Amino acid sequence: MKLTIAGDSHGKYMVAILEGLPSGIRVDEELIRRDLFRRRNCYGRGKRMKMEEDAFEIVSGLWKGITTGAPVTILIPNRAGNPVKDVRSVPRPGHIDYAAWVKYKLPDLNIYVERSSARWTVALTAAGSLLKSLLKEFGIEVLGFVTRLGNVEARDIPGDFEELKRRRDESVVFCPDPEATKEMVAEIDRAKEEGNTLGGKVKVIARGVPAGIGSYSDLFKKLDSKIGSLFFAIPAVKGVVIGSEEMWYGFDYLDEFELEDGKIKRKTNNLGGIEGGITNGEDVWVNVSVKPIPTTGKPLKSVDLRTMEPAKTPYVRSDVTAVPPASVVCEAALAVVISDALLEHLGDGNIDDLKRRFENENLPRWNDGFWKEHYR
């Protein structure tokens, strides 16, 4: 499977193209609408998100709502115009401005923002949301939520998946801890008043991923390699940890095996469902660190590249925090990575053929099948 994303932040469209999908997947367009709404409407967003509608259109690859096997193209119009009309020559610390100017040498810092802006994640969100219809065929669900925002950390995170999802959806910052949600809202209000921005952490879970997806032999097909590659492409993502972030002692960290009704299970899931680049049958857990947005309301020290004199950074329309929407984007990103690895494992064709391959795939027996079998 191949995902291509194109479009400028203030151009006519953002575009996502998915190639290599099987035919026969019934696409849930209402789910795509809901995910795009969640990305757009969360606490801490700026003025632009009030202008955008994200009214997507799927212009190829579907027939009567199901995939045909041809490339699926999603168009999302941009409604907001570019608020900066003048040439900008003062780079913002933490943004692409200076580094891109050094490499590409075009004399207007506005140019580089068009690609590096997080606006392109609307296309990633749409693509990942569409792929949830594929994952659903195999009983796989993906869920992202906020675990930290500024100095506020979630303390009461339910272990039950459905309860976690319900609480997440009730929170304006997508945090499943109601008390932490209130504190996060206050933290955002305080940062906005100060002209500051906030970073934080999000967690994404993929439930129902079978054992044996990924690779250990091809370093770049290892599932954790793919997760890191796509997640680090998301603007503001500065850290990706699969599984527990507490990994100091082996006795505490390593997930011991146990048998339960002929099935191999784990007592814990500190490894986050991946060992050596391959899924082990437990839920896949990804922890993501998101930096503060580099456009602050209070000017920072910089240099005017045109005059080479000290200068203050300009204010460009922006959010107070990218953390809540990042939980939606990272959820979509994990859906993309799992879908890609799953299709690599099961092959091409019609979705019913892939499901039969999946259902008929037995786990191996030791020593060419002469010993006891075990089950997924």
UniProtKB/Swiss-Prot annotation:
<comment type="similarity">
    <text>Belongs to the chorismate synthase family.</text>
</comment>
<protein>
    <recommendedName>
        <fullName>Chorismate synthase</fullName>
        <ecNumber>4.2.3.5</ecNumber>
    </recommendedName>
</protein>
<comment type="subunit">
    <text>Homotetramer.</text>
</comment>
<dbReference type="InterPro" id="IPR035904">
    <property type="entry name" value="Chorismate_synth_AroC_sf"/>
</dbReference>
<dbReference type="InterPro" id="IPR020541">
    <property type="entry name" value="Chorismate_synthase_CS"/>
</dbReference>
<dbReference type="GO" id="GO:0008652">
    <property type="term" value="P:amino acid biosynthetic process"/>
</dbReference>
<comment type="pathway">
    <text>Metabolic intermediate biosynthesis; chorismate biosynthesis; chorismate from D-erythrose 4-phosphate and phosphoenolpyruvate: step 7/7.</text>
</comment>
<feature type="binding site">
    <location>
        <position position="317"/>
    </location>
    <ligand>
        <name>FMN</name>
    </ligand>
</feature>
<feature type="binding site">
    <location>
        <begin position="115"/>
        <end position="117"/>
    </location>
    <ligand>
        <name>FMN</name>
    </ligand>
</feature>
<keyword id="KW-0028">Amino-acid biosynthesis</keyword>
<keyword id="KW-0274">FAD</keyword>
<feature type="binding site">
    <location>
        <position position="45"/>
    </location>
    <ligand>
        <name>NADP(+)</name>
    </ligand>
</feature>
<dbReference type="Pfam" id="PF01264">
    <property type="entry name" value="Chorismate_synt"/>
</dbReference>
<keyword id="KW-0288">FMN</keyword>
<feature type="binding site">
    <location>
        <position position="39"/>
    </location>
    <ligand>
        <name>NADP(+)</name>
    </ligand>
</feature>
<dbReference type="GO" id="GO:0009073">
    <property type="term" value="P:aromatic amino acid family biosynthetic process"/>
</dbReference>
<dbReference type="GO" id="GO:0010181">
    <property type="term" value="F:FMN binding"/>
</dbReference>
<keyword id="KW-0057">Aromatic amino acid biosynthesis</keyword>
<keyword id="KW-0456">Lyase</keyword>
<feature type="binding site">
    <location>
        <begin position="291"/>
        <end position="295"/>
    </location>
    <ligand>
        <name>FMN</name>
    </ligand>
</feature>
<dbReference type="GO" id="GO:0004107">
    <property type="term" value="F:chorismate synthase activity"/>
</dbReference>
<feature type="binding site">
    <location>
        <position position="276"/>
    </location>
    <ligand>
        <name>FMN</name>
    </ligand>
</feature>
<dbReference type="GO" id="GO:0005829">
    <property type="term" value="C:cytosol"/>
</dbReference>
<comment type="function">
    <text>This reaction introduces a second double bond into the aromatic ring system.</text>
</comment>
<dbReference type="GO" id="GO:0009423">
    <property type="term" value="P:chorismate biosynthetic process"/>
</dbReference>
<dbReference type="InterPro" id="IPR000453">
    <property type="entry name" value="Chorismate_synth"/>
</dbReference>
<keyword id="KW-0285">Flavoprotein</keyword>
<keyword id="KW-0521">NADP</keyword>
